[in-house]
């Protein structure tokens, strides 16, 4: 008899709205580049990550593929051959959280390769690593700041390209590796280098709840869940289903979302004004703003989408002094947004005036 294991529902997490939003946006568009969650222990970081995996819809995979290949997307060499022969069978499975141990070696992460066998058999000679297991799942790194920098680079390269590439003695093997990357850390235990910080799409600082009612609600919900997980899960089932459907619809809408040239120029202008050198910042803001628009059921990006995206994508890319926490110059950002809105309103008024003039001219003809 199989015992059902219930995960604490995502929609039952009290507070931490910014963290939850950052996770949802990455679920809508993994190309955002993951999220770094900074905060002390006991602030629902790992609970939210596991709850997200349980919340997300099932994925379609190639049956028996060690890399969870998407039958409608990028395929490994084995699946390509199966597709050519018309033997590509598919199945569905739940997404899962793949944990990366702090002491993981490079071989454990990217996989091990038998060179002699690889020359003859190609990808079949690969002993899959964590990046194979993580493909189309959630890769979770707790205490990412304690991980070896080289391992972080390997992970972030794979996350950016969507492929894990293994090169040994002139032999090159690759397989799809696109995942939702989530790193958590306690800043009191050490910071990440700016070069590494920049590679994470979004960053969120989480703190303990300071509202008495919220803290009491957490106690009640955790006790209720521990006492009867099934009943508690069913209590939030409707909310879970609604959020799941909203994410599915946002994914479908994402490619239809457009952003105006005015907003693109504004994003780049803000990044320059704030002294952010990397172009990755601009690109991440655009991708995040589009995901926000899709999440809100729109096919166009607004200035409010851009503002919210900047609050998630820019703080960790700001220049700062040693031991100074990452933070965004909110006053400067607010000022620039107000200036943009005023200019936009002025431009719209001028357009309306020109329209009125054209109407009058046509009436006089």
Curated annotation (Swiss-Prot):
Family of the protein in this entry: Belongs to the Mg-chelatase subunits D/I family.
Name this protein carries in UniProt: Magnesium-chelatase subunit ChlI homolog
Record: residues binding ATP: 40-47
CDD domains in the record: AAA
Region listing for Disordered, in residue ranges: 340-365
PANTHER family reported for this sequence: MAGNESIUM-CHELATASE SUBUNIT CHLI (PTHR32039), MAGNESIUM-CHELATASE SUBUNIT CHLI-2, CHLOROPLASTIC (PTHR32039:SF9)
Listed Basic and acidic residues bias regions: 344-365
InterPro entries associated with the record: AAA+_ATPase (IPR003593), CHLI-like (IPR045006), ChlI/MoxR_AAA_lid (IPR041628), Mg_chelatse_chII-like_cat_dom (IPR000523), P-loop_NTPase (IPR027417)
Superkingdom of source: Archaea
Keywords noted in UniProt: ATP-binding, Nucleotide-binding
Keyword rRNA processing: no
A molecular function (GO) term: ATP binding
Pfam short name (any one): Mg_chelatase
């Amino acid at each position: 008899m199989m015992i059902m294991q219930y995960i604490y529902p995502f929609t039952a997490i009290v507070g931490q709205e910014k963290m939850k939003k950052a996770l949802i946006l990455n679920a809508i568009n993994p190309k955002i580049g993951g999220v770094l969650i900074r905060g002390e222990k006991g602030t629902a970081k790992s609970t939210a990550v596991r709850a997200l995996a349980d919340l997300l819809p099932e994925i379609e995979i190639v049956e028996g593929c060690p890399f969870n290949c998407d039958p409608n997307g990028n395929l490994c060499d084995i699946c390509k051959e199966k597709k050519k022969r018309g033997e590509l069978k598919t199945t569905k499975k739940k997404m899962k959280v793949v944990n990366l141990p702090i002491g993981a070696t490079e071989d454990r992460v990217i996989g091990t390769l038998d060179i002699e066998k690889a020359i003859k058999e190609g990808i079949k000679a690969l002993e899959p690593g964590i990046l194979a297991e993580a493909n189309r799942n959630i890769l979770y790194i707790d205490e990412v700041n304690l991980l070896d920098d080289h391992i972080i680079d390997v992970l972030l390269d794979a996350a950016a390209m969507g492929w894990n590439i293994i090169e040994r003695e002139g032999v090159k093997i690759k397989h799809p590796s696109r995942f939702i990357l989530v790193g958590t850390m306690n800043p009191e235990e050490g910071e990440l280098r700016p070069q590494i910080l920049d590679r994470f799409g979004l960053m969120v600082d989480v703190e303990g709840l300071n509202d008495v009612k919220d803290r009491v609600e957490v106690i009640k919900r955790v006790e209720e869940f521990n006492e009867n997980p099934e009943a508690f899960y069913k209590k939030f089932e409707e909310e879970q289903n609604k959020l799941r459907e909203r994410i599915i619809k946002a994914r479908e809408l994402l490619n239809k979302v457009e952003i105006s040239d005015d907003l693109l120029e504004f994003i780049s202008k803000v990044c320059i004004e704030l002294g952010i050198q990397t172009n990755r910042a601009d690109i991440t803001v655009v991708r995040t703003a589009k995901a926000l628009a899709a999440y809100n059921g729109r096919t166009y990006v607004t200035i409010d989408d851009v503002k919210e995206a900047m609050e998630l994508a820019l703080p960790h890319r700001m220049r700062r002094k040693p031991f100074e926490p990452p933070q965004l110059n909110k006053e400067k950002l607010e000022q620039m947004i107000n200036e943009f809105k005023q200019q936009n309103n002025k431009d719209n008024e001028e357009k309306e005036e020109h329209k009125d003039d054209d109407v009058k001219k046509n009436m006089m003809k």
